[in-house]
Amino acid sequence: VAVRLSVLVAAVALAATGCSSPGSASADAKHPAGTVLRVPQDFHTVQQAVDVARSGDTVLIGPGVYRESVQVTKPDVVLRGTDRNAVVFDGGVRLVNGITATGAGSVVENLTVRDYLANGVLFTGVTDQKLQQRGAGGSAYDPLDTSRFPAVQGFRATRVTTYDNGLYGIYAFDAHGGVIEDSYASGQADSGIYVGQCRPCDTLVRGNTMAHNAVGIEITNASEGVSVLGNLVTGNRVGVTVNSNDQEALAPQHGAVLAGNVISDDNATDTPEQADGGFGIGIGIGGGTGDRVQRNLVQGNTAVGVIITDPPGHPASGDQVTGNRVTGNGEDLVLAAADPSNCFSGNQPATQSPAGLEGLAGCGANGASSGASGRGSLPSGRAASVQAPSGVPFSQVPAPPAQPSMPDPTAAAVPATGLPGTVDPDAYPLPTDSGAVPAAH
């Protein structure tokens, strides 16, 4: 149902004046639940359509370049492009955020977002627009008040292409119950996908491709129900990081699962510089607790394949690295954390630091380190020494290739409720090669 602008404007005007005449009821009847609002046919800008939308509506966006920042504040609104590659939000390296969704159940799908100073797509419970302008949190910002800004409930990003943004491509911060899937992120000055400051998160990151970012996927102070499954993370400076820090609330991070991913060749020079100087790292756990890294293919990273470290004030503990294929990295496995409950088993490494790591800190039948009760601390392992080269400005990273679009963008839309649904990491086997993932959902 496409509703014309004049009808909707009349409905809004009547609501604003508090009119209770039969005309008001008639206008409501012409805006039934699930209305499709079309841009540019019915509205000149996306924000105009979003402002008129009600819960359960879809804003369907036709091909074009939209130079605007969009705020989605109402619940259960779906923002969808008719063509993933031809519907483009462009910040012109001038606007701060592309699409910011604070409404519960928001969906952003089948479109491209590029050249914003901060984030391409932001899902957050932080409703203060001044804080949103600063990125709404993240590694460069102070902790935010989770009582004042409770997590937004329900979000989804599907088939989103985001590139050349100054912080994050797709950013879920202070958000719960979501899915980020089948998306492509490149050229971000920080990370392609970032999940931060949530407990429980109940967030699924699956089937995405991360390339030519400073960091591919970043999980910070995000705990309970974080699943990173079946993604391709290649050609970044750093592949995947799982962190605890004091620059956001809800530390320490706990209980993420990384399974069935390919993390390869994360030492690309044609990328933005990583803020901490990281380069050539496949998977890095910095102060994470109770995380599981299993059945991932981790190869070709010049510094290290998988490393566990203790950042100041946040000792890593209870992390399990099992059943991966970690090969052809500067150092395949590195344990630089003191707690004996971290363990490594069955990862097929050629190199380990400290030497014999899997024998000294193997995982027992219950997943805990087989030597946790009596082994004591091991010598701290070290990654191979790598000098990070100079990077390129985020706005100058080449655009990614065209990506698969929705088969039928006119299909009925579904808000982001009841997510992520059943999540089964065991359904994601060890990839046989770098072409094995991602698989569309």
Enumerate the predicted regions with their spans.
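Acidic Gly/Asp/Thr-rich repetitive segments characteristic of extracellular carbohydrate-active
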Residues: 27, 32-61, 65
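Short glycine/acidic-rich loop motifs that flank beta-strands on beta-rich extracellular proteins
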Residues: 66-72, 91-98, 117-123, 166-173, ...
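Parallel beta-helix/beta-solenoid
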Residues: 54, 74-75, 84, 103-104, ...
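C-terminal motif of bacterial Sec signal peptides marking the signal peptidase cleavage site
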Residues: 15-18
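Bacterial signal peptide processing site
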Residues: 20-22
